[in-house]
Amino acid sequence: MSQLQVRHDWKREEIEALFALPMNDLLFKAHSIHREVYDPNEVQISRLLSIKTGACPEDCKYCPQSARYDTGLEKERLLAMETVLTEARSAKAAGASRFCMGAAWRNPKDKDMPYLKQMVQEVKALGMETCMTLGMLSAEQANELADAGLDYYNHNLDTSPEYYGDVITTRTYQNRLDTLSHVRASGMKVCSGGIVGMGEKATDRAGLLQQLANLPQHPDSVPINMLVKVAGTPFEKLDDLDPLEFVRTIAVARILMPKSRVRLSAGRENMTDELQAMCFFAGANSIFYGCKLLTTPNPEESDDMGLFRRLGLRPEQGAAATIDDEQAVLAKAAAHQDKASAPFYDAAAL
């Protein structure tokens, strides 16, 4: 009998009851649903690039790109087009069919939109799907990006509405929901998830998933991030989350949003192979691959492929994953810091 339910009216107590299930029961339920919709042995592969690093005016307490915290990160302007295209060609050669671009902004400026649209068009001309995360979007900006051919847009909710004020004060929860609404209305696909391990309670993890699952349409992709603690940020000394609670979050996300991609996102570099294996069984079916986070590297491509072989997993053919995570888009920023001579797009203000 099928356990799959596509609903948009989940109550908090229902979700908390799922979190409270014995682990074996929860994993059985999540994996059964996962198997109904997806090939459980295929994992979508994502490649991404930070196209503008640092100097963000927001105060997200987890983020080393905030200008408010001394994390040793050097700010950079928008990358030159040829630099972006070189990275995209490399990603395609490595097997990616979707290229993901992220900028550390509160929101893109209107004067940067022509350049961003050109970037979308030129990456698409390589035969790749495109995705971006640029901060908040107006309805007009979402329509412009959609008209340029952007396939996916990421904007995370981060946590529950109740805990949100302890994480961020410079934009509201409604700001985030409005951006998701603009993206969906434009015809682009929505990527939205959150970060766990930020000192939140279990009910906050349930609240985050409730918000995502009760959107008018489920996100096409749901990145679940484990906090990457970066020196200099307010969250650098938080206690580690019990890894099994992370697995529970993946499993409940799969149950609530059975047809969405559930992305095992930032924080994998600190996860054991055994923990990742449990996440794949619980319903995660996408990863970031070959990327480098600001402070620590993502698992090496060879390590990921070795893990795939040990688990009998294979990369999904013909579809690489999207950029759906503002924390994971911190990817590659550290690598760029060592390229002081790299060309930038001069017209864009920091």
Swiss-Prot record:
Signal peptide: none annotated. It catalyses: (4R,5S)-dethiobiotin + (sulfur carrier)-SH + 2 reduced [2Fe-2S]-[ferredoxin] + 2 S-adenosyl-L-methionine = (sulfur carrier)-H + biotin + 2 5'-deoxyadenosine + 2 L-methionine + 2 oxidized [2Fe-2S]-[ferredoxin]. Gene3D superfamilies: Aldolase class I. [4Fe-4S] cluster binds at residues 56, 60, 63. Pfam families: BATS, Radical_SAM. SMART domains: BATS (SM00876), Elp3 (SM00729). The keyword Plastid does not apply. The keyword Iron-sulfur applies. GO terms for molecular function: 2 iron, 2 sulfur cluster binding; 4 iron, 4 sulfur cluster binding; biotin synthase activity; iron ion binding. Keywords: 2Fe-2S, 4Fe-4S, Biotin biosynthesis, Iron, Iron-sulfur, Metal-binding, S-adenosyl-L-methionine, Transferase. Binds 1 [4Fe-4S] cluster. The cluster is coordinated with 3 cysteines and an exchangeable S-adenosyl-L-methionine. One of its GO terms (biological process) is biotin biosynthetic process. Its EC number is 2.8.1.6. [2Fe-2S] cluster binds at residues 100, 131, 191, 263. Residues 41-268 form the Radical SAM core domain. Catalyzes the conversion of dethiobiotin (DTB) to biotin by the insertion of a sulfur atom into dethiobiotin via a radical-based mechanism. Belongs to the radical SAM superfamily. Biotin synthase family. This is Biotin synthase.
